[in-house]
Amino acid sequence: MTSEQPIPDITATPAWEALRKHHDQIGETHLRQIFADDPNRGHDLTVTVGDLYIDYSKHRITRDTISLLVDLARTANLEAHRDQMFAGAHINTSEDRAVLHTALRLPRDAELIVDGRNVVEDVHAVLDAMGDFTDRLRSGEWTGATGKRISTVVNIGIGGSDLGPVMVYQALRHYADAGISARFVSNVDPADLIATLADLDPATTLFIVASKTFSTLETLTNATAARRWLTDALGDAAVSQHFVAVSTNRRLVDDFGINTDNIFGFWDWVGGRYSVDSAIGLSVMAAIGREAFADFLSGFHIVDEHFRTAPPESNAPALLGLIGLWYSNFLGAQSRAVLPYSNDLARFAAYLQQLTMESNGKSTRADGTAVTTDTGEIYWGERGTNGQHAFYQLLHQGTRLVPADFIGFSQPIDDLPTVEGTGSMHDLLMSNFFAQTQVLAFGKTAEEIAAEGTPAAVVPHKVMPGNRPSTSILAKRLTPSVLGQLIAVYEHQVFTEGVVWGIDSFDQWGVELGKTQAKALLPVITSDGSPQRQSDSSTDALVRRYRTQRGRTG
């Protein structure tokens, strides 16, 4: 099913043409000049949402650019689409589904009727079940088959059932307070599971199998191998004490041997990449507890309310999404670097890759017609200062335009003094954060370098051209609430871009064919006798070489 109403071509609108002309006018105007012409922009082009201070002044935009981008958003009916999403309309048109990840963090006393049900009651029933279970786990009331307390939960999932929990656990592991750690298995490569289980005791290990349908190939393959590891040590009867499921398929969960009382459900209106604040976050709740998890959800809700109510001119996710679109469609940027100056956010860029690229990596609009402009930013990145010694060279002096998001915190969870005694290691980290955004924006001219006595032959090599844009996001401290706020800002950026491009940001048909083809190829590479010839010579040769190196005939 596609959208019943044709979607106007945004690139054929006066608002798009006005932005094109505006780009021609401001051209390559340097950020040095933009700041000189508008010296207060460093204070004015900021927005505070919850605990997040967001500075977007170091972008190659003027106040006129912002006004024109807002006009574009209104031309695309962003606010109406936003209201439809929050109301539970079926805006995932290709699958005829509501899109209600925002309902996962509504307070208990809220009401949202969708398809005849108050989904808030359903959400909190699951949250209560999660809380009761994790309370028992954390207190030691729930034990393994031998009576020992559980000390490690292993989440088995893939995609949204893995990337979100991995990232959040890494970010909030300092809040783990009950002696329970979490590990994660996603890859069907056996090395992943083998390494994860190598030093674990089956008697103190609990597995969470996270699969909506309970039929995902990678997840069920790993879960079956994990069950074998457990039963080899403790016997078949131990499965019910050492496995729980996050799924909607009670029959398959029961067939696997998991007690159906230990199923934590979710709904088809929650996409995998938007599900870390659902039962998919059970491993996180087990580690940090239900109260900290509630704080995590409250952070999402703070930004949800801001996005739902603020006009585009002062709406942080909308503005950042529109700025991203400005670079993608008018300045030719193809990627965005995500640079958290926090070791705890080591997995944040990987998480955002799925959130953004699976959502907006589309070439077909929601009405089934082809898009008429580039869509989908390529997200990548690394924590600072590691990235500075890896790829910042390209950001500073390369030929490609790469807008960057810098994320930092004023107060670390832990800190150490520097050897010199001037501040702390965290101060040193954040001095790099501020310096990098400054140098990217303003650079250093040949004249400035020559004035320092640099040999003339070396001057061109040391020129820092600047005019490289960035967003700075600063919060006091990385808490569960702040992490929820940060994720929600990016969720709603994705939505904003998708609305303007006219695409369905909530399906992912592009991942299906490869999975189907893999199932078809598995018997080809494992069967006895000569394999079926493939339709292309490359795949055929690869399959035959693989079979030979595995000692199989044909």
Curated annotation (Swiss-Prot):
Biological processes per GO annotation: gluconeogenesis; glucose 6-phosphate metabolic process; glycolytic process
Recorded GO MF terms: carbohydrate derivative binding; glucose-6-phosphate isomerase activity; monosaccharide binding
Listed Basic residues bias regions: 544-554
InterPro entries reported for this sequence: G6P_Isomerase, G6P_Isomerase_C, Phosphoglucose_isomerase_CS, SIS_dom_sf, SIS_PGI_1, SIS_PGI_2
Keywords tagged on the record: Cytoplasm, Gluconeogenesis, Glycolysis, Isomerase
Reaction catalysis annotation: alpha-D-glucose 6-phosphate = beta-D-fructose 6-phosphate
Pfam families for the chain: PGI
Sequence segments annotated as region (Disordered): 527-554
GO cellular component: cytosol
Pathway(s) this gene product operates in, as recorded in its UniProt entry: Carbohydrate biosynthesis; gluconeogenesis; Carbohydrate degradation; glycolysis; D-glyceraldehyde 3-phosphate and glycerone phosphate from D-glucose: step 2/4
Primary subcellular site in the record, as a coarse category: cytoplasm
Enzyme Commission no: 5.3.1.9
Active site: E358 (proton donor), H389, K515
Isomerase is among the record's keywords: yes
Enzyme class (EC, first level): isomerase
UniProt keyword Metal-binding, yes or no: no
Compartments where located: Cytoplasm
Biased composition (Polar residues): 527-540
Annotated family: Belongs to the GPI family.
NCBIfam families assigned: PRK00179.1
Role, per record: Catalyzes the reversible isomerization of glucose-6-phosphate to fructose-6-phosphate.
Listed name of the protein: Glucose-6-phosphate isomerase
Protein species of origin: Mycobacterium ulcerans (strain Agy99)
